[in-house]
Every structure is written in structure tokens, then in C-alpha cells.
Amino acid sequence: MHGSKPPSSARTPSRAISIRIARDPNDLMLVTAIRAAVYLAEQNCPLEEEFDGNDLVAAHFIGFVGSEPAACLRVRFFGEFAKVERLAVRHQFRRSRVSFKLVQASFDYIKRKGFKKIYGHAQDRLVNFWAHFGGKPLGHNRKITFSDFSYTEMVLEIEPGPDAITLDSDPYVIIRPEGDWDRPGVLDISSARPVTSPLRSAALVEP
């Protein structure tokens, strides 16, 4: 009817951007789908080069535009630095700010973990994107090429946040779900139960 509101399914979908850390196999499937669309389909990267064996030893971030998974990014941790890598944005979302918010969320996470340096490999054509966040060429003049692109080593000096997690942090904070340290987790809740396990006083049995 004229003048009636369109059904909800016909309304313009939300373009709000949200970021979350991957927590379960379903989230990792989203990461795989995004990277396959960008790197395998668009850049013709071989499967074994894109999915390099490091995905299960890393933290992954997923960026959403509305309810649609639009982008992802991977973070790995080393002794002195964290490495940001595998930033992928689906082509229809590249005019949004999801990539900027995704990178910033990962940097905030890295600061919370107490790191002082972020390292990455920027495709030469994307050096200016990383410079926007304060990244600078590492300066070692090492030429890096893989998966048919040339890369520049980038480094970003950061200050850990005032709430960075250390050995002095509340032990319950340390065991909360990764990246969600400000909310009580399931183990916080379990701490309200008395110590009743029948094994609580059992001595270890010598082999």
C-alpha cells in the first residue's frame, strides 16, 4: 500500500562496522572464506602458500560491515614483537573503513599484551597504508618476495597500554577468554564454588 513502511527485509542493511577476535571453528571458517576470496581468487595465490600452517598458532580478527564478514587479519607473537599479517578485505568493502578499524583493534590488542614492537611485511604498493598507523620501513634493505609480490619490512614502535597484562595482573584476568579480559569469564564464575573435587588432596602417583 502507498505510504506503508517497507518490510524489514527490504530496508537498507546496517553498515555499522564491528570487530571481534575469532574464538571457535566457525570463526576460523569465516577467516578462511575471506582469505580464499581475496588471495586465492583475486591474487591467484597458491593454496599451500596462503594457508601456511600458522593459522592454528595465531590470533585472528574478523571485521564485519553490518552482519556481513568483510575482512580479517592475523597476529602472531614472538619474543620481542608481534607480527601483523594476512590482512584481507573483500572487494565490495574496500571503500569502507573496516580495514583501518581492524588494524587498530589488533594494535590495541597487542598493546594490551604488553608488546612494544609490531612487525609486518607490506606489499610495496601498500607501504603508505601502514605508514598511516606509524609504521616505518625496518631499514635492513632485505629484499623479500613471495607469492608473486615484493614486500617491505615494516616496524611500529608502541607503548604498552596502562592496563597491559603482566605477572602482577589479577590471575582471573589472565585466564579469561583471549582479548576479552575486562569481563568475568566462566572460570571467574566457577571460583564461587567451593573446592570439592575428590582429587584436591590426592598425591601424585610415582611411575
Would you name each region that the model predicts?
Residues 21, 28-32, 43-93:
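A conserved beta-strand-loop-helix scaffold within acyl/acetyltransferase catalytic domains
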